[in-house]
Amino acid sequence: MKIIIIDDDKLVCSSLKTILSSKGIHVCATGNNGAEAIKLYEQHRPDILLMDIRMETINGVDASKQILSSFPQARILFLTTFRDDEYIIKALQMGVKGYILKQNYDCILPALEAVYMGQNVFNTEIITRIPDLWRQKESFPIDNLNSREMEITIL
């Protein structure tokens, strides 16, 4: 599996690269903002782009939109500390493959493996909020969830 890590915290990038490389994952590049994410994605075409949301220059949401408009098959996994409803909704609307919280570092490797295998991955805390967000927002799109994911979300 070939990935790119994008995070404005250089220590996070470096640590993740070391940890994931030791697990056999090829980290082909790292970057610190959305502009670098776009450039590095075009250059390396990774299996997965692991990216933070709030960053300088271009944030992760805007970078993802640009990448997905040019490469609709791109597999983007957000790794963030932010649980904001706005970000969760935008992630689902644009079709990113996952949204996991940095506080749960143990789930990063399994999340990468699941996304690599074609699954969507959201932390339990995020999944449990989706039905409430859906009810609050009349136009909340769930088109990017398959029937099984929607079934699990509604439970």
What is each of the regions a protein language model found here?
Residues 7, 52, 80:
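Active-site residues of response regulator receiver
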Residues 10-29:
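Two-component/phosphorelay signaling modules centered on CheY-like receiver
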Residues 33-36, 58-62:
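Acidic catalytic/metal-coordinating carboxylates
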Residues 39, 61-73:
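Short amphipathic alpha-helix used as the core "switch/output" element in two-component signaling
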Residues 44-50:
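Active-site beta3 strand of CheY-like receiver
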Residues 55:
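Receiver (REC) domain active-site loop signature in two-component systems and cognate sites
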Residues 86-92, 103-143, 147-151:
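Short, flexible helix-to-coil linker/hinge segments that flank and couple to helix-turn-helix
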